[in-house]
Regions:
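Alpha/beta enzyme core
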Residues: 7-24, 35-62, 69-85, 89, ...
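Terminal or standalone catalytic/regulatory effector modules within metabolic enzymes
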Residues: 26-28
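Thr-Gly-centered strand-to-loop micro-motif
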Residues: 224-226
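Active-site gating loops and adjacent loop-to-helix segments of metal-dependent hydrolytic enzymes
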Residues: 263-274
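His/Asp/Glu-rich mid-to-C-terminal helical/loop segments that flank catalytic regions of hydrolases
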Residues: 283-299
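Residue-level detector of conserved catalytic or cofactor/ligand-binding positions
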Residues: 306-316
Length: 316
């Protein structure tokens, strides 16, 4: 299976989220940050174990570390050929530089996020629309070969090049959602309902009443950022209420790093094979993705994604 866009990979999830489907049948697709190519493989292996779709997210920092947008995109294409049974999307996360985002589209990313949430409403609309128009028409995979996520409202916390103090956060205003989506033409909307980037000092207080109002305003995918540290029961409630994409970054870094540290402690000093050091990290990531697939009710949903893809415009 080729790389999919977020619109394609979440068609079935969004259908269930925006109709009177039984809340127990709804599910969200997990979106996970990576910093290295072995982590990319671990993400896909975890999804394969659960027959689930998955979204691989690269920050600009991760892209710089790996080498380039083109290198990341080529790695994703190779992984897609190696694991054809796993539907997945390559996503550029929280990008603010318009030219970098457009370069990612041309390089072969199948979803990009324009984060203009710290701008005023009209500027956010203008930038998000510019990226949506470009992405929908300039992907190497053809028309609609790249989809777009934007953010309305601001999460507190630190996400590499985006930093918002707790005092500066702003919840998503439901009254602005329909206008924002209609005027921009985006495919997924990241909402601010009480989560934050990074680890929490205390459990977040998610405003479920706000999520309910936002869900009524649009029929595109809703995205929950700041998934690290959110209690399992809150995840389940978000999914039941119509969240279609859930982002996890910081927590996954800890899972990987803890496994690598443990491997280093247990290996003899005469062992120099780096695969025995980073290999446990890759396995730990796969196990975490398998667990999150169950939590998000996404396990076993790969066939539904394949069916949903047929209802979207085919890519060249």
């Amino acid at each position: 299976m080729p790389l999919l866009t977020i619109k394609q990979i979440m068609t079935d999830s969004v259908r269930l989220a925006t109709t009177d489907a039984d809340p127990k049948d709804r599910y969200a697709v997990g979106a996970f940050n990576f910093s290295t190519i072995p982590e990319m493989v671990g993400l896909v292996e975890g999804a394969r174990e659960k027959n689930a779709p998955v979204i691989l997210m690269a920050s600009i920092g991760a892209v710089k570390y790996i080498g380039s947008l083109e290198l990341v995109a080529e790695a994703a294409k190779g992984i897609a050929k190696t694991y054809p049974e796993v539907p997945f999307c390559l996503h550029l996360d929280h990008a603010t530089n318009m030219e970098q985002i457009k370069q990612a589209v041309v390089a072969g990313f199948t979803n990009v996020m324009i984060d203009a949430s710290q701008e005023d409403f009209e500027t956010n609309i203008a930038k998000s629309k510019e990226i949506a128009d470009f992405a929908h028409n300039h992907s190497p995979y053809g028309i609609d070969g790249c989809s777009v996520e934007a953010e309305l409202g601001m999460l507190a916390g630190h996400e590499e090049n985006v930093h918002v103090e707790e005092s500066g956060k702003a919840y998503t205003d439901p009254a602005l959602v329909k206008e924002f989506v209609d005027r921009t033409g985006i495919d997924a909307l990241a909402v601010a309902i009480g989560t934050a980037h990074g680890f929490y000092k205390a459990a977040p207080k998610i405003k479920f009443d706000l999520l309910e109002e936002i869900r009524k305003q649009t029929d595109i995918a809703l995205v929950l950022h700041g998934g690290t540290g959110v209690p399992d029961e809150d995840f389940r409630k978000c999914v039941a209420m119509g969240m279609s994409k859930i982002n996890v970054g910081t927590g996954l870094k800890k899972v990987y790093t803890d496994a690598v540290r443990e491997a280093i402690k247990t290996l003899p000093e005469t062992e120099y094979d780096p695969r025995k050091i980073v290999g446990p990290g890759r396995k730990a990531i796969a196990a975490e993705i398998a667990s999150k697939s169950d939590l998000f009710n996404c396990s076993g949903k790969a066939p539904a994604v394949k069916i949903g893809r047929a209802s979207c415009r085919e890519r060249v």
